[in-house]
């Protein structure tokens, strides 16, 4: 009983600290600061992914990680750096016998998600990150309490504790709350923000499911222990990483559509 109470207390304290830190970083609204902090988080998440994919850590893995993250700061399209890092790792695997083919996987997950998250901030600003946070948190909270109150139907065999009813409630709540945050110039209006929030929430659900699948596959409860009461970095950011990729893609194509419409109008 004492152990459970301590865990819950640690969970709330850690959650409060994370909210404060996130608020300060977004309030500062500084590209270099965001890049540096997110890079450190990426390094921790990458280490956790090595464990999930059962890949042995090596100098070449972390060298590629560091160089690709530095390149992302100067590159106009950070996600390209994630894909290049995966290609470089594939080349290393092909050249050396020291690495198994699984060594490429951490560059895809969580790699692509972290680069997408940085891309969202770099291309669309702090308001886009806040929008993403609201959608993901609302989806998680809605799914948790909705599942507790109304959940009956298991959502998937890979995560039997999650229910279909909870997931649907989470997506609906995230869509509604997210639409009010994203309804400004970023999306072009309420209905577009509602549609985007719905898609992001939907994608975020599968980020959570994928992380659960990986943990069950290797027989562990948490991806790490760095966050007391919460587990690892990937335990907290799994939905966020999938959602970031979805949001960046949606906003990117929306910009292209707007530019095309202006061009055709001229």
Curated annotation (Swiss-Prot):
A Gene Ontology term for the protein's cellular component: plasma membrane
Organism: Helicobacter pylori (strain ATCC 700392 / 26695)
A UniProt-annotated Pfam family: CTP_transf_1
Record lineage: Bacteria, Pseudomonadati, Campylobacterota, Epsilonproteobacteria, Campylobacterales
Reactions accelerated catalytically: a 1,2-diacyl-sn-glycero-3-phosphate + CTP + H(+) = a CDP-1,2-diacyl-sn-glycerol + diphosphate
Family per similarity comment: Belongs to the CDS family.
Membrane topology: Multi-pass membrane protein
Pathway: Phospholipid metabolism; CDP-diacylglycerol biosynthesis; CDP-diacylglycerol from sn-glycerol 3-phosphate: step 3/3
Intrachain S-S bonds: none
EC number assigned by the record: 2.7.7.41
Regions that span the bilayer: 16-36, 52-72, 78-98, 101-121, 125-145, 164-184, 186-206, 237-257
Any one Gene Ontology molecular-function term assigned to this protein's record: phosphatidate cytidylyltransferase activity
GO BP, sorted A to Z: CDP-diacylglycerol biosynthetic process
The name this protein goes by in its record: Phosphatidate cytidylyltransferase
InterPro entries: PC_trans
Location(s) in or outside the cell: Cell inner membrane
Keyword rRNA-binding recorded: no
UniProt KW keywords: Cell inner membrane, Cell membrane, Lipid biosynthesis, Lipid metabolism, Membrane, Nucleotidyltransferase, Phospholipid biosynthesis, Phospholipid metabolism, Transferase, Transmembrane, Transmembrane helix
């Amino acid at each position: 009983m004492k152990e459970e109470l301590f865990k819950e207390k640690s969970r709330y304290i850690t959650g409060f600290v994370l909210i404060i830190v996130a608020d300060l970083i977004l309030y500062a609204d500084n590209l270099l600061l965001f890049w540096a902090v997110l890079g450190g988080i990426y390094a921790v998440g990458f280490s956790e992914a090595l464990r999930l994919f059962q890949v042995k850590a090596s100098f070449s893995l972390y060298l590629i990680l560091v160089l690709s993250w530095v390149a992302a700061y100067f590159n106009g399209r950070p996600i390209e750096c994630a894909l290049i890092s995966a290609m470089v790792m594939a080349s290393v695997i092909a050249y050396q016998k020291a690495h198994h083919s699984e060594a490429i996987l951490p560059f895809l997950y969580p790699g692509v998600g972290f680069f997408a998250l940085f891309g969202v901030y770099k291309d669309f600003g702090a308001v886009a990150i806040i929008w993403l946070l609201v959608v993901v948190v609302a989806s998680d909270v809605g799914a948790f309490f909705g599942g507790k109150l109304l959940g009956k139907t298991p959502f998937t065999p890979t995560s039997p504790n999650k229910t279909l009813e909870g997931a649907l409630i989470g997506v609906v709540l995230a869509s509604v709350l997210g639409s009010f945050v994203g309804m400004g110039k970023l999306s072009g209006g309420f209905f577009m923000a509602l549609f985007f929030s719905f898609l992001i929430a939907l994608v975020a659900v599968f980020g959570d499911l994928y992380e659960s699948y990986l943990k069950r596959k290797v027989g562990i409860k948490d991806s790490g222990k760095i966050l007391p009461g919460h587990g690892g970095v990937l335990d907290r950011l799994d939905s966020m990483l999938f959602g970031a990729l979805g949001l960046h893609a949606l906003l990117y194509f929306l910009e292209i559509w707007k530019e095309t419409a202006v061009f055709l109008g001229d």
